[in-house]
Amino acid sequence: MMKRILLAEDDNDMRRFLVKALEKAGYHVTPFDNGASAYDRLREEPFSLLLTDIVMPEMDGIELARRASEIDPDLKIMFITG
C-alpha cells in the first residue's frame, strides 16, 4: 500500500518541489497551502505522515500538529521550515 503524506506548506515553490520529490519516491502526497485546510482533510481521511511548515496563515504548523495528534495519536509528524 502506498504511503500517504499530508503536506502543509504555504510557499508555492517549496510545496511544488516537495510534491514532485515525494511522488517520485513513491509516496501519495495531498498538498495544502495552509494548516486549516490540511486539518480539515485530516479529519476526513487517514495519512501515514503529516509534513508541515511551522509558520503559515490561518493555522500554524505547531497548532496543526497538536490537533492532528488528537485525531490520530499514532500519526507521524515532521516539521519543515525555510
What is the meaning of each model-derived region?
Residues 1-6:
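Non-catalytic signal-transmission and effector/linker regions of two-component phosphorelay proteins
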Residues 45-51:
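Active-site beta3 strand of CheY-like receiver
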